[in-house]
């Protein structure tokens, strides 16, 4: 949500927006936490980056985290900007605790309509269905942790802790659902003021719709006092080690690297050097999913090898290309990615569209790619291509949010055997980040000459063929593979990497062992 705002503020200072633990791409805690815990984790981020004096901005729940950081680190935090500073009455807290409980998942997808309406009713001026979609996508991305942040916010004694803050505070108060509650903060601050923002211009989404204006308000306040020279000390960056499960075996780390179209996000498991007895495995996801699809199987296969799962450009957290591209272009990016890792040999694993990327990658790196494993092989007839192109069209966002419900119902028939609705929702929620590139993956897949390109591959190929929407198409791979086989998997389907992880991993492990 802060992307455009960060660009403005980052013109003359370091600007960082960290995902709270359990939200965005930050690793979740094992159980619900309180605002004090969120603030402590953010303090650890500052320490690990070697950051000295800072200014802190928070919005809604983030305002409470900002106040707590200021109290925990009074000599480090210089000034605070709060976008809304809600001080609740006890009756309001009881009401909010009831209203902001999780919405149960519904097989018909109606929970998405409820969530959409919750955000739509408080949209700010200039916020259209596209922006509301982004807000919804971020909200449901947290899954069952959706309500953890709200419950922590309602448990926090915000008024009392606000009184303790001795740093200067600017409260930006748009005319939104917290405007009345924010006015109560006026008499609680030692050194602060509330700036009421015009209701016809500012509200939810103002960081996206009016980033220049918001940045101007913030910059004027922060720059009113001289800064210290130790805001960031590059020599200290990364020197402070924080105890973290990120060092534990089987931990899936998230990182970014540069690509030809911006930042490329990827997940990886990197076991200790002594345990790396097998070639690295690179995984390519289906469209419009992300590398998140491989997390559970990465933990099993990553015990004796490096396993990486990059998000294809335009999906997950990877930045999109400027226009629709082809499978060959995706493979070029993944070629760069592998070469940057310095791997001499790799095995690759592609899921649906990712199977085509894996195939094309062999054509780019025939000496490095030793084995190709495919989760389905999309080999279409001309009639099937015409049908798929008609059904997998770009999504049009509607003000009532029914496009999400319709898409949920579109994929629902392919719910895999024994796949819990929670797993289906997690996979589906990844697709909700539909920006302009949503349909580009399908477009590229339907344009790719899979049979022709696969027939030219002389590396060993294993096609895992579960009973899903590509079952019949994948059988055709047996007629074009030079080396390898199609492995039919009756009783398996979508979600099998989560519901039958060990069985799928065992088949892959045996195939790539030579």
Describe each PLM feature range.
Residues 7, 169-208, 299, 461-492, ...:
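Conserved loop-alpha-helix segment in the C-terminal half of the alpha/beta-hydrolase fold
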């Amino acid at each position: 949500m802060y992307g455009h705002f960060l660009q403005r503020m980052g013109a003359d200072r370091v600007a960082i927006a960290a995902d709270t633990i359990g939200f965005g791409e930050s690793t979740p805690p094992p159980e619900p936490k309180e605002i004090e815990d969120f603030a402590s984790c953010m303090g650890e981020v500052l320490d690990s980056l070697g950051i000295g004096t800072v200014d802190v901005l928070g919005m809604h729940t983030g305002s409470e985290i900002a106040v707590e950081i200021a109290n925990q680190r009074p000599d480090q935090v210089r000034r605070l900007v709060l976008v809304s500073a809600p001080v609740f009455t006890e009756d309001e807290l009881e009401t909010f605790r009831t209203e902001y409980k999780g919405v149960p998942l519904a097989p018909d997808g109606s929970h998405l309509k409820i969530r959409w309406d919750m955000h739509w009713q408080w949209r700010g001026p200039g916020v259209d269905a596209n922006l509301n979609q982004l807000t919804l996508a971020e909200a449901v991305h947290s899954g069952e942790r959706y309500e953890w942040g709200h419950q922590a916010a309602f448990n926090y004694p915000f008024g009392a802790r606000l009184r303790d803050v001795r740093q200067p505070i600017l409260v930006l108060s748009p005319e939104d659902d917290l405007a009345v509650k924010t006015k109560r903060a006026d008499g609680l601050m030692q050194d602060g003021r509330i700036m009421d923002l015009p209701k016809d211009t500012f509200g939810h989404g103002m960081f996206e719709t009016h980033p220049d204006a918001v940045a101007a308000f913030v910059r004027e306040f922060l720059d009113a006092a001289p800064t210290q020279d130790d805001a960031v000390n590059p020599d200290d960056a990364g020197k402070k080690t924080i105890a973290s499960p990120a060092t534990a075996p089987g931990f899936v780390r998230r990182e970014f690297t540069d690509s030809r179209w911006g930042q490329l996000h990827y997940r990886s498991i990197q076991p200790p050097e002594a345990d790396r007895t097998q070639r690295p495995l690179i995984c390519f996801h289906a469209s419009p999913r992300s590398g998140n699809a491989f997390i559970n199987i990465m933990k099993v296969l990553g015990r004796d090898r490096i396993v990486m799962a990059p998000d294809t450009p335009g999906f997950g957290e990877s930045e999109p290309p400027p226009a629709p591209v082809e499978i060959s272009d995706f493979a070029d990016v993944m070629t760069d990615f592998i070469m940057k890792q310095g791997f001499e040999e790799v095995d690759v694993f592609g899921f649906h569209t990712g199977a085509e990327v894996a195939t094309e990658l062999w054509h780019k790196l025939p000496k490095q790619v030793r084995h190709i494993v495919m989760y389905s092989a999309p080999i279409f007839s001309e009639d099937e291509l015409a049908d798929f192109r008609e059904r997998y069209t770009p999504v049009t966002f509607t003000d009532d949010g029914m496009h999400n419900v319709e898409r949920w119902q579109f994929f629902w028939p392919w719910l895999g055997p024994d796949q819990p609705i929670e797993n289906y929702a997690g996979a589906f929620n990844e697709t909700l980040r539909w920006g302009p590139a949503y349909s580009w993956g399908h477009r590229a897949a339907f344009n790719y000459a899979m049979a022709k390109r696969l027939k030219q591959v002389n590396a060993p190929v294993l096609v895992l063929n579960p009973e899903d929407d590509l079952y019949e198409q994948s059988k055709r791979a047996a007629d074009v593979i030079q080396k390898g086989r199609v492995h039919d998997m009756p009783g398996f389907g979508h979600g099998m990497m989560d519901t039958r992880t060990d069985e799928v991993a065992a088949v892959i492990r045996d195939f790539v062992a030579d």
